Regions:
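Multi-pass, polyprenyl lipid-linked donor-dependent membrane glycosyltransferases
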Residues: 1-15, 40, 46-47
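Membrane-interface transmembrane helices that cradle and orient dolichyl/undecaprenyl
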Residues: 11-26, 37, 59-61
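Perimembrane helix-loop-helix junctions
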Residues: 14-17, 47-84, 100
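Membrane-interface alpha helices of multi-pass inner-membrane proteins
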Residues: 26-42, 48
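Transmembrane alpha-helix segments characteristic
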Residues: 32, 87, 198-223
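Signature aromatic-anchored transmembrane alpha helix within multi-pass, membrane-resident enzymes
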Residues: 32, 52, 79-87, 252-290
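Hydrophobic alpha-helical membrane-interfacial segments at the cytosolic entry of transmembrane helices
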Residues: 32-33, 67-94, 112-117, 208-210, ...
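Hydrophobic, aromatic-rich transmembrane alpha-helices
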Residues: 150-202, 209, 254
Length: 290
């Protein structure tokens, strides 16, 4: 999960470089890191959507400037080169298993019903944003069934139980509250950034939104197909963390340009909540280990 996450972030970085200079060298670098991301874990295939978006946008932009066959040929060569490099690197193992064992390329191991099975609970309850499970301290695969609550809790404490008595109960409440506030403001920032008339780097923000949406859709689809406690873990949504942070600070930057005092106040509050969240979360974990 961590290696795939790193390679996905590197792919987005190389994609931005490619957009600024769509040379063959940058195409090769982009294709290699994309292929490695997919090879590490099929979740890396989510990058196909933002890559497709940027490729098409770049081609259309160039076509509007220079409407001739050379432009078409140039980008056909670039897209072909990207596919010839990235697809073999990303799918060689899946194709090997398909040939040797007739295993489908997108195969997911079927798991028999166990204690952590959540398919016997209605989807409405599992997606309820106001679940009582938030009142429980930690995410447990054999007990929890609500997806939003599980994501919030596992993003802080993983799938383990830590100290929960005395002062720890207060710290836990503060940490969860900070996490909820930051999550809400992240969605507010996404909305404001995308619908603000004058917003810097809007193209890249749309690219990140594509990855954000498809990651969430893929995550929900997995939880419907594989309704188990461990399917709800935040590790399957790791890309949302840097994407959300980019939207938050891009929004704050735009607010500062229009209202310096308001922007600085929001900036201070976001940093304060993040700092409190990090300090208290690590305090709970480290003191539990000790």
């Amino acid at each position: 999960d961590m290696l795939c996450f790193m390679l996905m972030m590197l792919t987005l970085f190389r994609l931005i470089i490619w957009y600024k200079e769509s040379s063959y060298k940058n195409t090769i670098f982009l294709a290699i890191v994309t292929g490695l991301s997919v090879m590490t874990k099929t979740t890396g295939a989510l990058l196909a959507f933002p890559i497709m978006f940027i490729f098409l946008f770049k081609f259309i932009s160039e076509w509007k400037k220079i409407k001739n066959k050379k432009t078409i040929k140039k980008y056909l060569r670039i897209f072909t080169l990207f596919g010839l490099i990235s697809l073999p690197i990303g799918l060689w193992y899946n194709i090997r298993n398909l040939i040797l064992f007739k295993q489908p390329i997108m195969y997911i191991l079927e798991i028999p019903n166990e204690l952590c099975y959540t398919g016997n609970v209605s989807l409405f309850y599992r997606l309820n944003l106001f679940s009582k499970e938030l009142l429980d301290p930690f995410a447990l695969t054999d007990r929890d069934v609500n997806i939003p609550a599980y994501v919030l809790k596992s993003s802080l404490f993983g799938e383990w139980s830590w100290n929960y008595f005395g002062i720890y109960k207060i710290l836990y409440f503060i940490v969860i509250f900070c996490n909820i506030l930051l999550t809400i403001y992240t969605f507010v920032s996404i909305f404001q950034c995308l619908f603000r008339k004058k917003q810097d780097n809007k193209l890249y923000l749309w690219m990140l939104l594509f990855l954000f949406i498809f990651n969430v859709v893929s995550f929900l689809g997995m939880n419907i197909k594989l309704p188990y406690g461990f399917s709800m873990d935040f590790r399957y949504l790791l890309t949302l963390l840097p994407i959300g942070a980019i939207f938050v600070y891009a929004n704050i930057e735009s607010i500062i340009k229009n209202n310096k005092y308001l922007g600085n106040y929001i900036y201070g509050m976001v940093n304060f909540l993040t700092t409190i969240l990090l300090i208290f979360t690590n305090l709970i974990i480290f003191t539990s280990i000790i």
